[in-house]
Amino acid sequence: MRSSWIEVDLSAIEDNVRTIRSFLKPGVKLLATVKGNAYGHGAAEVPRFLESLGVDAFGVAFAEEGVTLRESGVTKPILLYGRTFSDSYGLLFDYDLTPNIFDVENASEISEEAVKRGKTLKVHVSIDTGLARLGIDLKDGTKEIIEQIMDMPGLEVEGIFSMFANSRVRSGFEDIDTQMCIKQFEKMVDLRNQLEKDGRKISCWHIADSAAAMLFPQTQMDMVRIGSSLFGAWITDVMPKDVSFRPAMSVHSRLACVRPSPIRGSFTSLMSIMT
């Protein structure tokens, strides 16, 4: 047995899922973000456990992470947050992964791959409402770009999503952060109204993470994405007193030895620590 190890408490994760569900509206789906090896908690084991708890979908950074989930036995939808490049197109179809699309060129290439394979692939389109990262810029013509993607053969635009710039609401910046979140959400609603006016129906709209779902319940839309809160992270400076999350990870080590050190003695290489 190693002298140091990490333990992951699945009961803590279960409690955290229960806590998050307690402030979700009826019918709102739950997507568990498990990128980065499930935040270091184990990308093979934790998602399987979350699936047994009834989580509706998973989010990862790129296709190879999605493959790990599939090979571990996960069957629920897996959304890729990052861009999928051409050398990973095959993985989308072989492992039933849902790419994030935010430009026509990428969409067209994946559409061609779908047609070549005789398949239809579910995709989500991301829009930039203020984070200034990935996503179609919200400006004149955004609706038309999305409609162009929706009309491409072999693609089914199942969802449209965005990410908040700062939903954690920092202490001392409550007004600024709240206004930004509401502004971003209103942009999403406006786009949804524009598309529905044209008869375009999208089944899954999502922008809220754990903090937003709790602090701004109107932003929950069709699905909420949860990440670090699954594992016990403090998700906002203004957490309600009746809400808490349990840390799922603990680090353990066995003591190797204890030895005294004289005054002005040194230890470790390069004498970097002095008493």
Where are these regions (language model features)?
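A charged N-terminal "starter" segment
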Residues: M1-T98, T120, E156
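Active-site loop/helix belt of alpha/beta enzymes
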Residues: R2, G36-R48, E113, K122, ...
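Short, acidic/turn-prone active-site loops that include or flank metal/cofactor-
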Residues: E64, G82-D87, V104-A107, I127-T129, ...
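Active-site-adjacent beta->alpha loops and helix N-cap segments on the catalytic face
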Residues: G66-T68, A107-E113, R117, Q179-K183
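Short, well-ordered alpha-helical microsegments
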Residues: G66-V67, S86-Y89, A107-S108, T142, ...
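Glycine-rich anion/phosphate-binding loops
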Residues: T98-S108, L138-E144
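Functionally critical, mid-to-C-terminal surface segments that flank or help form catalytic/ligand
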Residues: H252-T275
